[in-house]
Amino acid sequence: MKQLLASPSLQLVTYPASATAQSAEFASADCVTGLNEIGQISVSNISGDPQDVERIVALKADEQGASWYRIITMYEDQQPDNWRVQAILYA
């Protein structure tokens, strides 16, 4: 099984591994040394809970060809369940 590790304040989310595609995985700050930064993404107006936000970030990272991503900011807007997130992408 593939594990998506969240930031310390979030829960661990587990996804089944795909036989056909390799998805981008979460990388903590202490694990990115030596990885090649390939860009950043920002996503806003995400409805749902923190796990939904992480799934969206993983999908966006996949679209950009990233193997890893690190969420650098994630916060809930003034409206409940409306999130903004920024992440760094790595190859």
Swiss-Prot record:
GO biological process entries: response to stress
Keyword Thylakoid carried by entry: no
Main subcellular location of this protein, as a coarse class: periplasm
UniProt-listed SUPFAM superfamilies: YdgH-like
Domain of life from the UniProt record: Bacteria
Family the UniProt entry places it in: Belongs to the BhsA/McbA family.
Official protein name in the record: Uncharacterized protein YjfN
Gene name tied to this protein: yjfN
